[in-house]
């Protein structure tokens, strides 16, 4: 299969979290097309597993979808060069008030490949040690703890 070739990328908007770009592409047939693209510096997410096997989740407001969500702790990298393991450890403590010396890589997700280059490295944290939350001024997070079975029920009922 022949590749598409990007011949130009114009940065239309440079925000704090995202860059909005317009790419000029040549298709394998030689046709020139334009695609909008969101560039993201990357993120990390972490599944905090308590000593009894339950998982700490965060409930927070998500403006883009106008509702509260139940999710694992996650956040954007401070810079494009920040290692995602460092980001995951930071987000774990900031959002949950727990830290861990045993954080293991699980997988990389690309949640919106049709229009974004965002990648989220997912980790699992064990041997949690209680500290305290360090929320950003605009973050309002409630912690909720669930068994794996309870989370599966929430996924199957479209609550997550």
Question: What label would you give each PLM region?
Answer:
Residues 1-7, 31, 68, 114-115, ...:
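Nudix hydrolase/Nudix homology domain
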Residues 35, 44-90:
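Conserved Nudix-box catalytic region and its N-terminal flanking loop in Nudix hydrolases
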Residues 5, 99-106:
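A short coil-to-beta-strand element that immediately follows conserved catalytic motifs
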Residues 9-11, 108-112:
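Short, solvent-exposed loop/turn elements at beta->coil junctions and helix N-caps
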Residues 21-29, 112-131, 144:
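Active-site-adjacent beta-strand/loop module that shapes the phosphate/pyrophosphate-binding cleft
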Residues 14, 19-21, 42, 116-119, ...:
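A generic structural signal for well-ordered coil/turn residues at beta-strand boundaries
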Residues 9-45, 51:
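Acidic, metal-coordinating catalytic segment for phosphate/diphosphate chemistry
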């Amino acid at each position: 299969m022949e590749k598409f070739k990007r011949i130009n990328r114009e940065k239309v908007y440079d925000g704090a979290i995202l860059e909005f770009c317009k790419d000029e592409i040549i298709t394998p047939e030689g046709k020139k097309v334009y695609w909008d693209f969101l560039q993201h510096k990357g993120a990390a997410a972490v599944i905090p597993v308590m000593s009894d096997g339950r998982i700490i989740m965060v409930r927070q407001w998500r403006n883009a979808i106008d509702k509260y969500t139940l999710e694992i702790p996650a956040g954007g990298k401070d810079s494009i060069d920040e290692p995602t393991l460092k980001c995951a450890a930071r987000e774990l403590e900031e959002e949950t008030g727990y830290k861990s010396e045993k954080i293991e890589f699980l997988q990389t997700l690309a949640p919106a490949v049709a229009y974004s280059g965002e990648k989220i490295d997912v980790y699992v944290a064990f041997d949690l040690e209680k500290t305290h939350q360090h929320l950003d001024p605009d973050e309002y997070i409630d912690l909720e703890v669930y068994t794996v079975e309870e989370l599966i029920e929430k996924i199957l009922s479209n609550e997550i």
